[in-house]
UniProtKB/Swiss-Prot annotation:
Organism: Homo sapiens
GO molecular function: alpha-2A adrenergic receptor binding; alpha2-adrenergic receptor activity; epinephrine binding; guanyl-nucleotide exchange factor activity; protein heterodimerization activity; protein homodimerization activity
Site (Implicated in catechol agonist binding and receptor activation): 214, 218
Species classification: Eukaryota, Metazoa, Chordata, Craniata, Vertebrata
Record-marked site positions (Implicated in ligand binding): 131
Protein name: Alpha-2C adrenergic receptor
Length: 462
């Protein structure tokens, strides 16, 4: 991934003129200074007030990014609802965003405000490598997540059995290795001592082939993969929803089957937030199942007692004795406690009823859990689609304008301030994922509240 620091340097050069070591004057991956030029800092391009304002805004962005992504990591590792193996991808993605905010953004801000590189040649190479690695890993993570979503939709049973935490962790390691393979070789193989500049600069290779290959390999190709995968996911989910609605789901007045907020269709029996919906009228809720069982058992015992009392009443009637309702009721209680054949029959029938009800509850609970899992999978797919869409929207302006610069150079170069805005919007993406999780996912929202307010209440108690 081409470093946004290069975009900053290009924008500074465009604004400062030919003496500012612009893109055409810089080489790749190093700190430059003119052989006979002064090493003193250049005249600042921002006023003191502008420097303070930009530092405050970017400082808030850094803190917000770190806090939000730390909350994501804590939520996934501590919340039972978020402990699914696939959420480890979000932990790794949040870690990359935290590293961007702590190891890249502060130096990009300093480079922008000072208009030259202050931190030396060694850290310039480290900074460029980390910048490219973290930003590339973000989009490779999203590609891996999209493939995970695709396999979980098309091979639900088989893939979910194979998707263990160990396999997910191995995939995450592979994602970081792929990102390193994409990021580091250009920084190492293309290093050369750059030409003279008015003051130290830190930037990547400026050759056309490198700009285009880095943009394609680090952004446009992964975006194409993600788009195709999610289009396939949508088609498969839509086809399954239509099939299920034709077989089982009731059709509304307008002929449309009920769907969830993500358009993928709701699993039957799954509530809005993935919890089991209340059962139909002829099926009692789980919380009253014990009371229902007791009522059925008492009814069975009463019926057995009445049958026995009726038999005894018939014999007594022959002797001139009748059996009223009280006797029948008494017989029911006696039958339920007596060791005779009738009592044994009543106890056996109550055991059979209890066994039947327990099997029915277990089956209903299993179906409920399966539908909850399906609903959560759909919500997770939708949230990740939003994450990918926001990522593309944030980074597309930078990569598009950067590619244009690589093709036609100054003829296609956008104004310097606009170019700076584009690459800082890309950095802002690192702070948006926690916001997306909070807005679109109730499990994350509940977990964030639990983490923040539980600790606050503990502080008040102490």
């Amino acid at each position: 991934m081409a470093s946004p620091a290069l975009a900053a340097a290009l924008a500074v050069a465009a604004a400062a003129g030919p003496n500012a070591s612009g893109a055409g004057e810089r080489g790749s991956g190093g700190v430059a200074n003119a052989s006979g030029a002064s090493w003193g800092p250049p005249r600042g391009q921002y006023s003191a007030g502008a420097v303070a304002g930009l530092a405050a805004v970017v400082g808030f962005l850094i803190v917000f990014t770190v806090v939000g992504n730390v909350l994501v990591v804590i939520a996934v590792l501590t919340s039972r609802a978020l402990r699914a193996p696939q959420n480890l991808f979000l932990v790794s993605l949040a870690s990359a965003d935290i590293l961007v905010a702590t190891l890249v953004m502060p130096f990009s801000l300093a480079n922008e405000l000072m208009a030259y590189w202050y931190f030396g040649q060694v850290w310039c190479g480290v900074y460029l490598a980390l910048d490219v690695l973290f930003c590339t890993s973000s989009i490779v993570h999203l590609c891996a997540i999209s493939l995970d979503r695709y396999w979980s939709v098309t091979q639900a049973v088989e893939y979910n059995l194979k998707r263990t935490p160990r396999r997910v962790k191995a995939t995450i390691v592979a994602v970081w290795l792929i990102s390193a393979v994409i990021s580091f070789p250009p920084l190492v193989s293309l290093y050369r001592q750059p030409d003279g500049a008015a003051y130290p600069q830190c930037g990547l290779n400026d050759e056309t082939w490198y700009i285009l290959s880095s943009c394609i390999g680090s952004f446009f190709a992964p975006c194409l993969i993600m788009g195709l995968v999610y289009a396939r996911i949508y088609r498969v989910a839509k086809l399954r929803t239509r099939t299920l609605s034709e077989k089982r789901a009731p059709v509304g007045p307008d002929g449309a089957s009920p769907t969830t907020e993500n358009g993928l269709g709701a699993a039957a029996g799954a509530g809005e937030n993935g919890h089991c919906a209340p059962p139909p009228a002829d099926v009692e809720p789980d919380e009253s199942s014990a009371a229902a069982e007791r009522r059925r058992r008492r009814g069975a015992l009463r019926r057995g007692g009445r049958r026995r009392a009726g038999a005894e009443g018939g014999a007594g009637g022959a002797d001139g004795q009748g059996a009223g309702p009280g006797a029948a009721e008494s017989g029911a209680l006696t039958a339920s406690r007596s060791p005779g054949p009738g009592g044994r029959l009543s106890r056996a029938s109550s055991r059979s009823v209890e066994f039947f009800l327990s099997r029915r509850r277990r089956a209903r609970s299993s179906v409920c859990r399966r539908k909850v899992a399906q609903a959560r999978e759909k919500r997770f797919t939708f949230v990740l689609a939003v994450v990918m869409g926001v990522f593309v929207l944030c980074w597309f302006p930078f990569f598009f304008s950067y590619s244009l610069y690589g093709i036609c150079r100054e003829a296609c170069q956008v104004p310097g301030p606009l170019f700076k805005f584009f690459f800082w919007i890309g950095y802002c993406n690192s702070s948006l994922n926690p916001v997306i999780y909070t807005v679109f996912n109730q499990d994350f929202r509940r977990s964030f509240k639990h983490i923040l307010f539980r600790r606050r209440r503990r502080g008040f108690r102490q």
